[in-house]
Regions:
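Short, structured coil/loop segments at alpha-helix boundaries
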Residues: 1, 7-11, 162-170
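Active-site nucleotide-donor binding segment shared across nucleotidyl transfer reactions
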Residues: 2-58, 62, 68-72
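Metal-dependent nucleotidyltransferase catalytic core
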Residues: 47-108
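Catalytic cores of NTP-dependent nucleotidyl/adenyl transfer enzymes across multiple folds
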Residues: 82-284
């Protein structure tokens, strides 16, 4: 998965950086990893703002050049410091691409491109905001995780997340339809009504019984996913139907600190169940 972007002697340092910085790989590269399919794509790395500079500096040490887009600060150190010194607003889950993203930084090396995506306060918020469920997969240092494996890997279907129609969404959905996934506006009725379905009316969380988790390291595979990834594993969500032609991956954000929050499934937030175990979140 990474050999296209890094030399052999750079892989172990990358893994150390990934663990130290909490970097998560997601996007089409991870879908290719799970399916064995191959198509042209960039490598998407997701990181919280406090670790942005360290992750970008590592890419530079591997020969990647920062390639700012129009309007971006042209020096990466200054750009990352600007974001760090300007506390991001707490985003609630919204129905447009980019929710939870502070900025995207492009790094290039020849014809290879890595996108370093700075997340405001929760990486999973960004992943759960993707256009459809087939790309809701990610890789940490020690585990590869598919959040909707039965749909994505078995039936090759993808539930479209509730996003207002726009050309970008249409193009993204068409691209994955061309790659073999059937796009669904609603979960199948039998799945939505079943407590045994990943698309049912159940509260989901990373590492639950519906996820497919592949350990990537021999030693660390002895430890459960949630023990090694507590910030990710403590988030939750649910599938909801929000209109005649739309469904959504639903959650609210509960703030823990300036640069940290958790996704909380909407039924939990509405019932304020988190208060029964002593958790205190702010949502505005």
């Amino acid at each position: 998965m990474l050999s296209k972007y890094f030399l052999t002697h750079e892989l172990e340092p990358f893994y150390r950086m990934q663990e130290d910085c909490g970097v998560v790989v997601s996007g089409s590269t991870v879908l290719q990893f799970f399916t064995g399919c191959r198509w042209e794509s960039d490598l998407d790395l997701y990181v919280l703002i406090p670790a942005l500079w360290s992750a970008g500096s590592f890419l530079s040490s591997c020969g990647y050049d920062y390639d700012p887009t129009l309007g971006q600060i042209t020096n990466f150190i200054k750009a990352s410091n600007t974001i760090l010194m300007s506390p991001p607003a707490l985003d609630h889950h919204t129905s447009y691409p980019g929710s939870g993203i502070a900025s995207v930084f492009n790094f290039k090396k020849g014809n290879r491109k890595i996108q370093l995506i700075a997340c405001r306060s929760n990486i999973l918020q960004v992943i759960l905001g993707f256009h459809s469920t087939c790309v809701m997969n990610f890789v940490t240092r020690h585990h590869a995780v598919s959040l909707f494996p039965r749909s994505t890997l078995h039936s090759r279907t993808s539930l479209v997340n509730a996003i207002d129609p726009n050309p970008t969404l249409a193009n993204a959905l068409a691209k994955y339809a061309d790659r073999g996934w059937q796009m669904l506006s609603h979960p199948p009725l039998q799945d939505y009504l079943s407590p045994e379905s990943e698309l049912g009316q159940v509260i989901r969380y990373p590492g639950d019984q519906f996820c497919y988790i592949r350990p990537l390291t021999r030693y660390r595979s002895l430890f459960p996913f949630e023990e090694l990834n507590p910030d990710i594993a403590t988030s939750s969500w649910n599938v909801s139907i929000v209109g005649e032609t739309r469904s959504a991956i639903s959650f609210e954000l509960g703030r823990v600190s300036e640069f940290k929050s958790h996704c909380i499934a909407t039924p939990i937030m509405e019932a304020r169940l988190f208060e029964t175990i002593g958790l205190v979140f702010t949502t505005s």
